[in-house]
Amino acid sequence: MTEEINIDTATLEQLRDVLTNKSGDVKLANRFRALFNLKCVGAESENQDEVHKAIDYIAESFKDDSELLKHEVAYVLGQTKNLHAAQYLRSVLENNNQQIMVRHEAAEALGALGDKDSLALLEDYFKNDPSIEIKQTCELAIERIRWENSEKAKAENLETSLYTSIDPAPPMPSDQESKVEKLQKILNNQDEPLFERYRAMFRLRDMGTDEACLALASGLDDDPSALFKHEIAYVFGQLCNPVTVPALIKTLKDEREAAMVRHEAAEALGSIATDECLPVLQSFLNDKDQVVRDSAVVALDMYEYENSTEI
């Protein structure tokens, strides 16, 4: 059986078979583990043939039914820093049969890759796609690619982040603003360009204090943008600060909230993994939204890992 494969010692082909559920009986959590192992090869191997093979195998999962898995696949491809992934991401963005959350993640990943050849496509979908989540994601990706290739980027004084992720926007320069209160105002000012609000968000993340976390939590309250709120929940999963747990639980429990926000809140609770997170996550295993149910499964696997002897 495929599930008996040791994912940490598996070949690329074995990882592909686990990821794509070739046997038909692989647990979702194990498919995610296979994905992250393939990502390590795609992002870190010096053998370009291996890198391209890992990326090709990862992209096979775009044929899957799982919205959660495909969205994570798109995210991972954006983190490989390899433009070989761009062809797959463009195809997903253009495919209206893919779920909005998957297409959004593909657009964001093109921004993470800094793919200048995708600018025209991103601009087209920014102007013409009916989904606000796709429009806003393309707006951010366009701004990120332009920023990355600008003189401004070379001149900015950015602190080295504790986090290795390639984010939808760079943090605000450390010499531009360092007061939490002012960053919070930029974060929550809906008249500011979304890119600047994201820059404030990632500056607050990198500050990482309880005060900064609570400032970020204020962005979950009344903002109309599901995209914006889902990014805050994602950032909380990186920070793993228990002070954010009440805001995440409130978000997860709010059935009026978009599934893309609630699912990210669930995964963040799995990463934080305090005792109060466990019963909350268990209570969402039968949620009305499939992506929230799947996220609860993955989050509980993360919770078990964080509280085990594996780390």
UniProtKB/Swiss-Prot annotation:
Pfam families: HEAT_2 (PF13646). Fe cation 2 binds at H230, E231, H263, E264. GO terms for cellular component: cytoplasm; nucleus. Keywords: Cytoplasm, Hypusine biosynthesis, Iron, Metal-binding, Monooxygenase, Nucleus, Oxidoreductase, Repeat. It is found in: Cytoplasm; Nucleus. It catalyses: [eIF5A protein]-deoxyhypusine + AH2 + O2 = [eIF5A protein]-hypusine + A + H2O. The keyword Iron applies. Pathway: Protein modification; eIF5A hypusination. Binds 2 Fe(2+) ions per subunit. Belongs to the deoxyhypusine hydroxylase family. Catalyzes the hydroxylation of the N(6)-(4-aminobutyl)-L-lysine intermediate to form hypusine, an essential post-translational modification only found in mature eIF-5A factor. This is Deoxyhypusine hydroxylase. The lineage of its organism: Eukaryota, Fungi, Dikarya, Ascomycota, Saccharomycotina. The gene is LIA1.
